[in-house]
Amino acid sequence: FDEDGVRTRVVNADHTAMLDVKIPQSSAEVFDFNEPHPVEIGILIGDIKDMTKSLVVKDALTIEYNTGDPTWLTLSANGVQKKVRCKNISLIKRLKVPATDHKWSMNLPWKQVKAFLGSCAKDPLFEILVNVQMVSLNAKSDDETLTLDLPSSEIDLHIEGESLITHITPAHFISLMSTTSAKTVFSAKGSAASVVETEWTESGLKLKGWIAPRT
């Protein structure tokens, strides 16, 4: 927490995908921060998941933290209040942004990418093939071949080089982008066999994600 808003960073269990979420002060209905310095707390996602997973778009979630009583984070929604015990921040490992190498960048429509990923969600990997003409997402199995081609003119594609390939696990990509609405266009950056970085805005939240390649 700081005067600009709230920020959190989470990573999945096998450390193959990481998400950075920023909630700007302007995106909150009410925001009150009276500390002279930023305040950090540590919580387990599982401790708050049950409180948040039932919320819909019009619901309001109130988050309260009192430095005078630093043991608890209080969540309130729809008349229900939950107090979550905070963890010792000094014992929590800091999540560092992975090294990235950006040789290509593009703006992708989530609706089409989601349709592709949903069709190969159980596959171990899919291919991102980027060249000057297009990006091609490809998944293969013994029974089928799945392809999504998006021309460079439609996705604002920029590339250094002729052709670059990266392999990603579909389930990790779907999980990382799970908060994304169908109409959202997200930016993606990467290189050959490198971390793929994504960035988008959703309902006032600023989100940035990183997905490790399959090697």
State what each model feature region is.
Residues 3-122, 129-215:
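DNA polymerase sliding clamps and clamp-related checkpoint/processivity subunits
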